[in-house]
């Protein structure tokens, strides 16, 4: 891996798969941060399921086991209490969520107008 080069996560995880030592260090540090954030989320909201998605999850075969292990070791929950899964909606999950939100806002506004 060359210093000063621009790189995305697809390339970074590709280098990790090839055994690049710097890429391994960077990917593990990223996954540590993501996993720590997920553990904080679990402690704050007590979910049964955490859904991960987006382009980064094209490396789910590496990320999910890593995060699952981190959560298993550090979250204050019973074993198998929280399931961490890959989104089935793919890269469009955020757009679909936004569409749902905007549709519900519009519906509430229309209900107010027609109740007058």
For each feature predicted by the language model, list its residue ranges.
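ATP-binding/phosphotransfer module of carbohydrate and carboxylate kinases, centering on a glycine-rich
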Residues: 1-116
